[in-house]
């Protein structure tokens, strides 16, 4: 049985809110994509870091992909709690060592202070980086991470648009087929 020698715990991918979203709406949405888990039963909830209260969040349906499952969960954070860290807690029977996964999301304000006019000062202030090569590596890593997030977000919306376009096309084709079938039935009666 291939399930005994494979890792079937949820694999998280996180998406942070865009600067445009936080500036325009004075709120931000954290998104957690959980992939490649089995079995289907999973529980996802959100908390402030080190908090006990479960926050109101949304989630999509659990979707089967080949022999495993995936699920989205998202939390919209209002302006008054944007400065706090948040955690996405994942309960699943195949979590490593049987411990709930806790996926940390940085404060929204802090996530954007690293992308400012003088990023060198920002990195030094928040991470105490003293070595110039460490600083450059850190900045390159952040740039790569931001590029990955932007690319993934664009890919997600592109596939979503293509999906809806396919649904409209399918509806049109089905309509034409039923119309043609109805016309041929009318011709046979006459």
Curated annotation (Swiss-Prot):
UniProt KW keywords: Immunoglobulin domain, Membrane, Receptor, Transmembrane, Transmembrane helix
Record SUPFAM superfamilies: Immunoglobulin (SSF48726)
Lineage of origin: Eukaryota, Metazoa, Chordata, Craniata, Vertebrata
Location of this chain's protein in the cell: Membrane
Disulfide feature: none
Alphabetized PANTHER family for the sequence: T-CELL RECEPTOR GAMMA CHAIN, T-CELL RECEPTOR GAMMA CHAIN C REGION 5_10-13
Matching SMART domains: IGc1
Chain intervals for the UniProt region annotation (C region): 1-157
Record topology, Cytoplasmic segments: 179-190
Topology term for the membrane: Single-pass membrane protein
GO cellular component: external side of plasma membrane
Transmembrane segments: 158-178
Protein name, entry field: T-cell receptor gamma chain C region 5/10-13
């Amino acid at each position: 049985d291939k399930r005994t020698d494979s890792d079937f715990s949820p694999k998280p991918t996180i998406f942070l809110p865009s600067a445009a979203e936080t500036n325009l709406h004075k709120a931000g949405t954290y998104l957690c994509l959980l992939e490649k888990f089995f079995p289907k039963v999973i529980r996802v909830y959100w908390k402030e870091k080190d908090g006990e209260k479960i926050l109101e969040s949304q989630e999509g349906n659990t979707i089967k992909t080949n022999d495993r499952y995936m699920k989205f969960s998202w939390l919209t954070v209002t302006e008054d709690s944007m400065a706090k860290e948040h955690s996405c807690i994942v309960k699943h029977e195949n979590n490593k060592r049987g411990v709930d996964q806790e996926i940390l999301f940085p404060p929204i304000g802090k996530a954007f202070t690293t992308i400012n006019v003088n990023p060198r000062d920002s990195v030094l202030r928040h991470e105490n980086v003293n070595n110039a090569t460490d600083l450059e590596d850190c900045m390159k890593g952040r740039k790569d991470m931001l590029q990955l997030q932007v690319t993934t977000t664009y890919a997600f919306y592109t596939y979503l648009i293509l999906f809806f376009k396919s649904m409209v096309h399918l509806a049109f084709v089905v309509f034409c087929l039923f119309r043609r079938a109805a016309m041929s039935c009318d011709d046979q009666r006459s």
